[in-house]
Amino acid sequence: MTNFKCISLLLAIVLVSLILNPTFAHNPKHNRPPRDPKDCPPPIPKKPKPPRDPKDCPPPQEPKQDPPPPEEPKQEPPPPKEPTQDPPEEPKIVTPSNEPEKPTPFHNLYIGYFSIVIAFGDSYTDTGNAQYMGSITITTTESSSSPYGSTTFGKKSNRLSDGRLVIDFITDALGLPTLPPYKETKANFDNGVNFAIAGATTLANDLFSKLKRIFLWKGTPLGIMTELDWYKKYQIDQLCKGLDQKACAEKLKTVLFWVGEIGINDFSRAVGSKIPLSSIAKSSVTYTVELVRTLIRNGAKNIVVQGLPPLGCLPLDISITPLSLRDRSGCSQIVNAAVVIHNQILQAKLELYRKLFPDVTIIYADSWKAFYAIRNNPQKYKIQEVNKTCCGFKQDDMNFNLQSLCGASGTSICDDPSKYISWDGIHPTESMNYHMTDQYINHQCCNPPFQELMKKKAPK
């Protein structure tokens, strides 16, 4: 009985348990006591990604924020461009009353490197000596209605062109006023002087007076040695006045000596005569070389010497050269062959002087190369006429007649001189002078390069 009671009690306990937890009997896997969250965490379902802790890992990768790129120079508005690149306005040039107020790309390009320019040469460089001495015929520059100087100066300019010469562009590049002619009595020579004489020759004056080829000049032409005599006097009386030898030598370092084309008149007067042009070439260059040597002996340290352009391409020489003696481009073969001889001798002599006087900078300005660079590619320079003259006798070939030169009765002026190489059949237009200067300064038509003049000097 007692056993029966015990068994009945045990069964009652089991029955109560089944009623309270019915799943216990059906799923043996769950025959475990329920988890207490304090004792252990719930099982991790197939490695779910744990939530990010901002302290432990980076935020979701926004476009990769690598180390911030080095700050590009803060893109503030770009700085104003240097004045050399298209300035908004061209500065006004302060010029003496006798100068044109027309700025050029050369203006002040090398300002401060030289304080004085002294020039020699012929009508391609003369700014008034021949005019002041009365050695130019009346049809050129004496009349107030003269076409000479009309493009730039608008009045008598004392220049044998419609405007500026190469030497005018050179002084403009150096930031200096135009050069007054030595024969202008009231001129200020503080920044230089021009000794060039239109019509000047290198050979004996009486030789050419016998040939009776006067062209634009009256009487017997003066020689290049006259210019040298003027310079010697000027150096003593003005340039180095009151200075001892050392101080004079120092002052001469600030001077640029410009020796323009010399010999053009020798060739022009001799063409068609019995004098061989090759002899003229060899003889005339001797005087140019002597001029350079004398300048060096007198203390010159910076010298530019212009060679001759192809004179056989001037309307003057073409007009007196038979067709059979002209080359394919219409130029005089004989004249140009002689010019080549002249230039070769001149360059060889200058090279010798560079070796003998290493402290002197001697530049050869290659006028032959510069001229052909322009003539052979006229469209590039907006030139339409390479053989015709702008101012001359329209009824003749090339608008040129030796008996009716520019300014004479019956002559006329072209509408736009900038489209012509030749102004009057002998002298270049201002436009051509500008392009020649550009070739010297910017296009390797100087040997050594024009910039060599500035290497030994610092602008003041």
Predicted regions and their residues:
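Conserved active-site regions of diverse hydrolases
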Residues: 2-38, 46, 82, 86, ...
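Long, intrinsically disordered low-complexity tandem-repeat segments
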Residues: 33-92
